């Protein structure tokens, strides 16, 4: 399921270089890492800003390409932060969270919390309402820390 009908904010300037298979780190928090892809990156950044006000410093990792997965970044984040969370506008089975979990299981065992669409049928509605309904918006990410 993809909910990316929203107008999303511009995160990077025009000089940002992207490399296939290399994630981009946004912030350097050590309390948690939030791996996000697509429209959920801006939601993760909103949550990051709100969490900082509570004294919780998280890093957001923009997974702009899932395949090939950036194993190096996943392991680095697992070593450097206390919590790992993936968030995606996709089924929690077979998506970003699963790809990260596979790396962790094989290379550096660590707990991963997944935010996404549970294995259920989709709904119709406005994109932001659906993100809230399925619990993949900034509020849901923020609430993971309460």
Please describe what each predicted stretch is:
Residues 2-146:
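Thiamine diphosphate
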């Amino acid at each position: 399921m993809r909910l990316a009908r929203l107008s999303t904010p511009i995160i990077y300037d025009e000089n940002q270089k992207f490399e296939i298979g290399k994630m981009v780190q946004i912030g350097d928090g050590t309390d948690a890492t939030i791996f996000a892809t697509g429209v959920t990156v801006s939601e993760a950044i909103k949550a990051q800003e709100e969490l900082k006000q509570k004294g919780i410093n998280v890093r957001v990792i923009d997974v702009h390409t899932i395949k090939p997965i950036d194993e190096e970044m996943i392991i680095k984040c697992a070593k450097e932060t206390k919590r790992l969370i993936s968030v995606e506008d996709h089924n929690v089975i077979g998506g970003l969270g699963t790809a990260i979990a596979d790396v962790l299981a094989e290379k550096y065992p660590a707990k991963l919390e997944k935010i996404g669409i549970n294995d259920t049928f989709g709904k119709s509605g406005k994109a932001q309402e659906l993100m809230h309904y399925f619990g993949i918006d900034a509020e849901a990410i923020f609430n993971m820390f309460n």
